[in-house]
């Protein structure tokens, strides 16, 4: 469409910064955004001059997850059935990819639902003091679609993960 791309990539030496920029949707990921993220990380992985990527959300929000409005209204959102051996973008974009280089999530504002999955998919998370992590999709009855429920327990321990997944409560940065 005619709208600006919701993903910007800035290269600075060996560091590639992938920036989510959909202020009107609090950086929620719709179909085109998922594709753009997928392409950005595919290029980063193939770029020999790049050694680390930083995933960053513009406008004080990391990512509010999958764009439920877009998913609800869009006919152009095919269901991805990844063929075996093909790295197809998941609903959140790169979260099924396995990269050969580290990705750092620079989280400020909200990293909730699918946004939390993107943060968990990254190898390292750097949280600003105002960061809020949460599995908010529990409140809307949308399960974590892209491996988040598998990764979260490995990362923060099963008990805490179940607490976040079952209650959908928000966790402030100092607790995270």
Where are these regions (language model features)?
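Conserved CoA-thioester-binding segment of acyl-CoA-metabolizing enzymes
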Residues: 2-58, 74
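Hydrophobic/aromatic residues within transmembrane alpha-helices
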Residues: 18, 55, 67, 118-120, ...
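Short, Asp-centered acidic motifs that coordinate Mg2+ and/or phosphate
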Residues: 52-54, 78-79, 104, 124
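Short, active-site-adjacent cap segments at secondary-structure transitions
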Residues: 60-64, 69, 112, 134
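Crotonase-fold acyl-CoA enzyme core
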Residues: 94-175
């Amino acid at each position: 469409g005619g709208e600006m791309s919701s993903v910007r990539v800035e290269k600075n030496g060996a560091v590639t910064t992938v920036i989510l920029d959909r202020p009107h949707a609090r950086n929620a990921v719709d179909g085109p955004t998922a594709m753009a993220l997928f392409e950005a990380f595919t290029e980063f992985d193939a770029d020999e001059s790049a050694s680390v990527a930083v995933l960053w959300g513009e406008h004080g929000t990391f990512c509010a997850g999958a764009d439920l409005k877009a998913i609800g209204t869009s006919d152009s959102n095919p269901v991805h059935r990844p063929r075996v051996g093909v790295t197809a973008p998941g609903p959140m974009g790169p979260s099924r990819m396995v990269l050969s280089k580290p990705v750092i999530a620079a989280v400020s504002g909200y990293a909730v639902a699918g946004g939390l999955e993107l943060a968990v998919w990254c190898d390292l998370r750097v949280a600003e003091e105002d960061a809020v992590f949460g599995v908010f999709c529990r409140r809307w009855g949308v399960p974590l679609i892209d491996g988040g429920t598998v990764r979260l327990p490995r990362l923060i321990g099963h008990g805490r993960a179940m607490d976040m997944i079952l209650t959908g409560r928000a966790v402030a940065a100092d607790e995270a």
